[in-house]
Amino acid sequence: MAKVSSVQKNLKRSRLFNKLKLKRQALKSKIYDKNLSLEERFNLVLKLSKLPRNSSSTRIRNRCAETGRPRGYYRKFKLCRNIIRELAGSGIIPGLRKSSW
């Protein structure tokens, strides 16, 4: 089980990301617009850098929905490998079973 504070910190980051996503995308699209002057684009970069760091998507860590474990995460199930193994073994996840050859 991951520390509750780590999980909460990550949730806070994802909420902030969702809140500022459109603003960040708009700034980035204007920054890459070659029709604007260099000075205007530089000012937009400064505006982007003034946004909170935690509003960036790279600051969000994928964590298991069950345990909060940050490693061995499967995006399809939003679970870590340990929990997937337990649930697949007990037949709770439909269509998933232990391989054998």
Curated annotation (Swiss-Prot):
GO cellular component: cytoplasm; small ribosomal subunit
One Pfam assignment: Ribosomal_S14
UniProt keyword rRNA-binding present: yes
Domain of life: Bacteria
GO molecular function: rRNA binding; structural constituent of ribosome
GO BP annotation list: translation
Keywords: Ribonucleoprotein, Ribosomal protein, RNA-binding, rRNA-binding
InterPro entries tied to this protein: Ribosomal_uS14 (IPR001209), Ribosomal_uS14_bac/plastid (IPR023036), Ribosomal_uS14_CS (IPR018271)
Annotated TM spans: none
Function: Binds 16S rRNA, required for the assembly of 30S particles and may also be responsible for determining the conformation of the 16S rRNA at the A site.
Record-linked PANTHER family: 30S RIBOSOMAL PROTEIN S14, SMALL RIBOSOMAL SUBUNIT PROTEIN US14M
Subunit structure: Part of the 30S ribosomal subunit. Contacts proteins S3 and S10.
Family: Belongs to the universal ribosomal protein uS14 family.
Protein name (database record): Small ribosomal subunit protein uS14
